[in-house]
Amino acid sequence: MSEQIKANNSELPPVTQVGVVVRDIAKAVDYYSTTFGWGPFKISEFEMKGADYNGRKIDCKIKMARARQPGIEIELIQSLEGDTPYTDFLKEKGEGLHHLGIRVEDVGATLAKLSGQGIRPVFSLSYPEIGLAFAYLNSDSVGGVMIEIMQMRRKDNI
């Protein structure tokens, strides 16, 4: 017998992204492309300056590969420099599913609403000049997969 659980009043949008942490992005892109036909992947490097990670400011550099599939975006992430949630994830769990992402209109407003439920971000950064902001919400107590809320100026920012 199945049971249906009623959602709370957070009214968050559906998941639109699956984030996977990998050690070698080229190897992962090759695997997902040749094995499953996913892609094309757009590969980019990002320097994140002044990100908030567990209450402290950090600088780090990552490489990302992103591909769109019907209804979902696949994001592969490799940490290149610095102490990040990705390096900690690799140390604690190895490669694998890191986060499920949802797009919101306003990250700040969403965080304010979720804070009323005791939910706090563990990693966040904002680039107001390009209309990009994101925050990871820790869910180690249930399932261990982070939730990423992201705000982007354009609907498809790949």
Language-model features and meaning:
Residues 1-27, 95-104, 155-158:
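N-terminal beta-strand motif that seeds the catalytic metal site of vicinal oxygen chelate
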Residues 46, 79-81, 105:
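Histidine- and/or cysteine-centered catalytic micro-motif in compact active-site loops
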Residues 146-158:
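Acidic/histidine-enriched, glycine/proline-rich intrinsically disordered or flexible terminal extensions
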Residues 10-13, 21-70, 109-135, 156:
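Core segments of cupin and vicinal oxygen chelate
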Residues 90-99, 110-112, 116:
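Short, solvent-exposed interaction modules
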Residues 3, 49-53, 84-87:
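A short, acidic/glycine-rich surface segment
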